[in-house]
Amino acid sequence: MISSRLKTLTPLAFALMVLAGCASKPVAEEVQVPSAEVYAKSLADADALSAAGNQEAAVSAYRKIAIDNPTKPDPWVKVAQIDFAQGHYSQAIVSAEETLKRDPSNRQAKSITAVGGLRLAVRSLE
């Protein structure tokens, strides 16, 4: 009796193990972090877009730089500055918080968070 159940359950258990192996996630590819020169050039290009007044393209460029360089605070603080200057205080605070995750002592990000919060509070009272 036990032997027949074991014979029936063994192929089923094997099939479940095979299916579980198929459902597992593939091994993640190693993230390629750009060199310091590529990072500096990308930042300079985004800065040029911002200086030319093309803030939307600059923010997109900074966000791409942030994705490519996840430990760097600079692109996030640049996005925060642009959002703050445009009066998008909530977005500026979010970007400043991203900066502070990477550089807890960044004064620019702390200022944007504090002043942006105050300006949002004033708006809510108007």
Regions found by a protein language model. Give the residues of each.
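Helix-start (N-cap) detector for alpha-helical repeat units in TPR-like alpha-solenoids
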Residues: 39, 73-74, 107-108
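Canonical tetratricopeptide repeat
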Residues: 78, 112-113
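Canonical positions in the second alpha-helix
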Residues: 64-65, 98-99
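Bacterial Sec signal peptide processing site at the extreme N-terminus
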Residues: 16-40
